[in-house]
């Protein structure tokens, strides 16, 4: 049997949880995310060209889905790169 003392205990962080980020698109009352607005889309892509997850971007579920589709569409029409050239 394994002894439970193998792993160090995780310490819980004391204090408040970090405040949830508010969706940028909901604040500006933007209904749909347009694939042609490359400047806005670039904020939600990493340096490596990956789409930021919802917990990092702070978007709501509805706008995160629209954002993902808009980024993929912009990549297909060559407005955004698929990957970064090194």
From Swiss-Prot:
GO terms for molecular function: small ribosomal subunit rRNA binding; structural constituent of ribosome. Keywords: Ribonucleoprotein, Ribosomal protein, RNA-binding, rRNA-binding. Coiled coil: none annotated. SUPFAM superfamilies: Ribosomal protein S18 (SSF46911). The keyword Ion transport does not apply. Pfam families: Ribosomal_S18. It comes from the Bacteria. InterPro entries: Ribosomal_bS18 (IPR001648), Ribosomal_bS18_CS (IPR018275), Ribosomal_bS18_sf (IPR036870). GO terms for cellular component: cytosolic small ribosomal subunit. GO terms for biological process: translation. Binds as a heterodimer with protein bS6 to the central domain of the 16S rRNA, where it helps stabilize the platform of the 30S subunit. Belongs to the bacterial ribosomal protein bS18 family. Part of the 30S ribosomal subunit. Forms a tight heterodimer with protein bS6. This is Small ribosomal subunit protein bS18. The lineage of its organism: Bacteria, Bacillati, Bacillota, Clostridia, Eubacteriales.
């Amino acid at each position: 049997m394994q002894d439970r003392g193998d792993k160090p205990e995780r310490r819980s962080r004391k204090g408040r949880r970090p405040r949830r980020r508010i969706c940028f698109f909901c604040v500006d009352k933007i209904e749909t995310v347009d694939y042609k607005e490359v400047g806005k889309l670039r904020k939600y892509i990493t340096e490596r060209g990956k789409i930021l997850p919802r917990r990092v971007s702070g978007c709501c579920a509805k706008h995160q889905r629209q954002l993902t589709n808009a980024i993929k569409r912009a990549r297909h029409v060559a407005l955004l790169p698929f990957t970064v050239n090194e």
